[in-house]
Design a protein with these regions (language model features):
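Extended, highly charged alpha-helical segments
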Residues: 116-162
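N-terminal accessory targeting/assembly segments
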Residues: 1-119
Length: 162
């Protein structure tokens, strides 16, 4: 279930080099940025990720495609390449489209705060019932993110909503 505990081709190990980005959106308290970054570093450390960089970004106008501005995404892409990061954690909520677009731009796996917390719960669930509940929550969370992930295999579309 966990994307971090698998050692498959698309999985991650506990020592995965990780970058954390906290987007400070309009209307949020600006004094919380350092606290949020420290908290996110602690959450990532809870599942053994190797946080190599943590940055704060002020977002004046959230973009529908990526949440962050174009220059900020370019900066993150350069940082991911420079540091050799395999995972980017956005300390906020991302839509499935934003997550996919960021992954395409930064060339690394991207998860948001909800995904990170689900991974922590999944790793720490002690009972079979707890593991099933976390897996159900994780599958529900992933459902919207899988909708357009196989579009490269489509040849034609038709009908209502297709």
């Amino acid at each position: 279930m966990s994307v971090f505990n698998r050692n498959e081709d698309d999985g991650f190990s506990r020592d995965t080099p990780t970058i954390i980005a906290y987007p400070e959106l309009p209307g949020t308290a600006s004094g919380n940025a350092e606290y949020r970054l420290e908290e996110s570093i602690g959450l990532a450390a809870a599942i053994g990720l190797d946080v190599i960089e943590a940055r704060h970004y002020r977002v004046r106008s959230p973009r529908a495609a990526t949440l962050l501005g174009g220059g900020q995404v370019d900066e993150l892409a350069a940082l991911v390449e420079e540091k050799g990061a395999e995972l980017l954690i956005i300390d906020g909520a991302l839509s499935p489209i934003q997550q996919r677009n960021l992954e395409d731009r930064v060339k690394a796996k991207v998860i948001d705060r909800t995904g990170l917390i689900l991974e922590i719960f999944g790793e720490r669930a002690a009972t079979a019932e707890g593991r099933l509940q976390v897996e159900l929550a994780h599958l529900d969370y992933q459902a919207g993110r899988l909708v357009r992930s196989w579009t490269h295999l489509e040849r034609q579309r038709g009908g209502f909503g297709f």
